[in-house]
């Protein structure tokens, strides 16, 4: 076991740390007797922790079954919120006044330290994020005079509020990989070519931008959509056929994809997680607020791309 730890890469240590934290959340859920869904919730986070700690050593089939088991827990509605030993509202208000704006220092440290490590070292941004999170945690404990135990309870409260959407980013990344293996890009290219006249630049631009929006909404990730839609429409039908500037249309296509991000629950980190953290009544309140701006920006992106052709 120790030999395996010594051979681990820096990023593996970050995954190990995340897995240990998720394991602690699982144990806390199992021990929370006031939690109506403590077995299902604890099992969900336990399976998730296993994927982080042992995922590299397990077969693809076993990792796949772990995901299916987690999905089954959500399907039968056994994932829910519990009791988190929160401080009284009066105490929170008093601490907010006492600490003031200094409370934002840990959050700022995460971004600053991640940037420094990612930009000036060879460790990479993800490793930098892990190191930054540890330092920020220490700063938060020093500023608030809280305890590690309290920190884990708050962490569990937040992860339970986020719920199943916490695993959505990984699932969407896998979906993008499967789409590429299945040759979806070629299918899209053939379908668009059969409907949109190749000599009509404006219609090709519309197809490119709307394609970015639709696939971003499906996959929840503009980067994954970009690889497929650009190889299917952007490169052959705009760059090759009409001599478009690849840098310009690529940048604008990403902006069009972000319009899709504003309109989909699949972009959970942006549109669903804030709803859970802010305890909004309308599950799609964030999306509804962003929808008009997204549509306006989409039209502007189409016109801007057409201008650069």
Where are these regions (language model features)?
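Short helix-coil transition sites and intra-membrane helix breaks within transmembrane domains
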Residues: 164, 177-184, 216-229, 259-268
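Re-entrant/interfacial helical elements at transmembrane boundaries that shape
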Residues: 224-237, 267-279
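Alpha-helical transmembrane segments of multi-pass membrane proteins
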Residues: 202-215, 242-263
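Juxtamembrane and boundary regions of transmembrane helices in multi-pass small-molecule transporters
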Residues: 18-32, 257-309
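Membrane-interface alpha-helices at helix entry/exit sites of multi-pass transporters
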Residues: 201-202, 242-250, 279-292
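Transmembrane-helix bundle segments that line or gate the permeation/cavity pathway
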Residues: 11-31, 37-88
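Hydrophobic alpha-helical transmembrane segments of multi-pass integral membrane proteins
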Residues: 196-236
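Core transmembrane alpha-helical segments of multi-pass membrane transporters/permeases
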Residues: 64, 124-133, 150-184
């Amino acid at each position: 076991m120790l030999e395996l730890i010594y051979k681990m890469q820096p990023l593996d240590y970050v995954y190990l740390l995340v897995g240990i934290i998720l394991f602690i959340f699982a144990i806390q859920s199992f021990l929370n007797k006031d939690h109506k869904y403590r077995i299902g919730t604890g099992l969900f986070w336990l399976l998730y922790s296993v994927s982080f700690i042992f995922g590299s050593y397990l077969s693809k089939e076993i990792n796949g079954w772990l995901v299916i088991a987690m999905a089954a827990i959500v399907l039968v509605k056994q994932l829910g919120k519990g009791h988190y030993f929160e401080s009284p509202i009066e105490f929170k208000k008093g601490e907010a006044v006492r600490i003031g704006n200094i409370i934002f220092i840990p959050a700022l440290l995460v971004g600053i330290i991640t940037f420094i490590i990612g930009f000036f070292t060879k460790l990479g941004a993800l490793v930098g994020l892990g190191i930054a999170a540890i330092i920020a945690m220490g700063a938060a404990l020093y500023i608030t005079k809280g305890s590690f135990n309290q920190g884990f309870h708050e962490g569990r409260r937040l992860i339970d509020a986020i719920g199943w959407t916490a695993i959505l980013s990984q699932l969407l990344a896998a979906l993008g990989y499967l789409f590429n293996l299945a040759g979806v890009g070629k299918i899209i290219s053939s379908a668009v070519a059969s409907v949109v006249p190749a000599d009509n630049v404006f219609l090709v631009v519309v197809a490119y931008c709307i394609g970015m929006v639709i696939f971003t909404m499906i996959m929840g990730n503009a980067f994954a959509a970009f690889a497929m839609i650009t190889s299917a429409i952007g490169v052959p039908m705009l760059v090759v056929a009409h001599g478009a500037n690849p840098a310009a249309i690529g940048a604008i296509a990403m902006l069009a994809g972000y319009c899709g991000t504003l309109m989909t629950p699949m972009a959970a980190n942006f549109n669903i997680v804030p709803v859970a953290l802010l305890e909004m009544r309308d599950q799609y309140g964030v999306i509804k607020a962003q929808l008009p701006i997204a549509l306006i920006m989409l039209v502007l992106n189409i016109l801007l791309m057409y201008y650069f052709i």
